[in-house]
UniProtKB/Swiss-Prot annotation:
InterPro entries (UniProt xref): Ferrochelatase, Ferrochelatase_AS, Ferrochelatase_C, Ferrochelatase_N
The protein, known as: Ferrochelatase
Top-level division of the source organism's lineage: Bacteria
Subcellular location: Cytoplasm
Similarity comment: Belongs to the ferrochelatase family.
Its job: Catalyzes the ferrous insertion into protoporphyrin IX.
Record-linked PANTHER family: FERROCHELATASE, FERROCHELATASE, MITOCHONDRIAL
Lineage of producing organism: Bacteria, Pseudomonadati, Chlamydiota, Chlamydiia, Chlamydiales
Keyword Lyase: yes
Subcellular location, principal: cytoplasm
Listed Gene3D superfamilies: 3.40.50.1400
Positions annotated to bind Fe cation: H186, E264
Pathway, per record: Porphyrin-containing compound metabolism; protoheme biosynthesis; protoheme from protoporphyrin-IX: step 1/1
Amino acid sequence: MVSTYLLANFGGPRHSHDVEVFLTSLLTDRDVTGGCLPSFLHKRLFSFIAKKRAPKVVPQYNCIGGYSPIYQDTEALAKTLSSHLDAPVITFHRYLPDTHSQTIQQLKTLGDLPVVGVPLFPHFTYAVTGSIVRFIHNHLPSLNISWVAHFGNHPQFISCMIDHILEFLQSHDIPTHDCCLLFSAHGLPMRYVNKGDPYNVQCEKSFAAISERLPNIETFLCYQSKFGLGKWLTPSTKEVCKTLKTNKKYVLIVPFGFTSDHIETLYEIEKEYIAILIDRKYQALRVPAIYQSPQWVQSLATIIQSTRYVEKHSLIKS
């Protein structure tokens, strides 16, 4: 029986009016921000933080065109992927609440038919993929769904990443012997890691597999987008950009934990980190997210069809 696929991504503001709603949905998610406050206090506190933060974030979106492309890119990917899989593909945008009812209704119409959930995140964390799984389970507890939990170490992902990087170097006439790659993944609070979240281990294995096949290129793994208090995974991308010591002429930042470009690649990497490297006299460039690779859709289809699916209960943080 042909499955229906649920293509899940982060979601992002489609215009400036979406920013506060997006941030509120993100920050009030306990899988993301955690804490021990009662639910009603947690929601009030982080709704307030989102409201205060939104005016500071809107100008960042204005710098990248006034919106995040992640929504439209995910919708476009779903259509193309559907033809590759020869099966229906439904989209889910985790932090765009006004899209949720349509997704839930589409899934309800499937009854007992099998669904395969495909979060577009190479490396599993309870804070992102786990949150997606929890949301679907809470709203559709009887849905016959299993999940592609992660794919960061899948041979097809590794090969696609390597081809994507090498094609970028070739298109910019950058010699492999004279460049350094900073693989930038999203950060994670150490309190998650200390409780057994496998995210950093998966990132390290994925990074090692890619670096092994790029022996002539200097590579570093780092983590970006720290938010709030407490210790996060290190080294931070920003600190690496400030302190990097290499004799290579070119330094490229590769979005590693992101399959789609969005505010954290188009603004944080492009406008902040690249600027630091340029100020330090490096020839610095951002490599587009793997979504831009012409091989990505076929690679993703292969990953989906060759992965052992996981049941929801092992993916939700208790």
